[in-house]
């Protein structure tokens, strides 16, 4: 090892590599860190941007409270074993693959686009506006003569999802000029800077508002939990990630369901059960009052408004509807 000379011309001792957690302790959420602490800390990436609010809400339903400051990239969480970091979904796979993060939440689209090798832990079907997959669509102005992807031969297309778009047109045997867009993609095609765009949409409302027409769907995407390959081999970290995934999946499943319970005379039980569209067979228990039972079940929230009047008409009493935080099978 080469040594530099000190002021008195004698060789200086070799420099020691200082761990990052000692140089930047704020990166580790203010916890006192040593090697043992790092081994029992899960560095978890929270997506910044469109998924941020929905993700924080899902964590809350799963039992975790995340607080994010207006200018902070280091959220706090009420679990000392988790060290969260706020990061754009587009960058998540890169930092997880490189080991800067143990795991994170991002889209399947950005994971594929990055080309990084990560473990896909589970799918979480939620987005900015609802519980459905999102789509990357090929769109053009309403008055464009372009009707099919092949009409874009030799044309210019702007998108953030460059690699997936190139693969799509390659499979179509269409030679188009695909350029990366830093933002305001919908405005570029409206201004005539490009001939078409590939843009993310949940409902299509924004495209319609910008006088754009969908030509085709490039791909669909859902939210994923991804993990670093080495972290996934660590038994403690893997169990922690799997537990978080289980609770988040339960929270998402509960989003569109409610609990329903009621009192029913024994003679009407079979009639009431026949009306209930339960996930599983409803729970029926004997009440202290002879000849009466309590029925409890979980159903889709969308059917409750039509169901309750029918239950009442068929003898159900004391009907209570209540929200659910998690549903885990």
Q: What is the predicted role of each segment?
A:
Residues 83-102:
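Short, structured active-site "lid" loops
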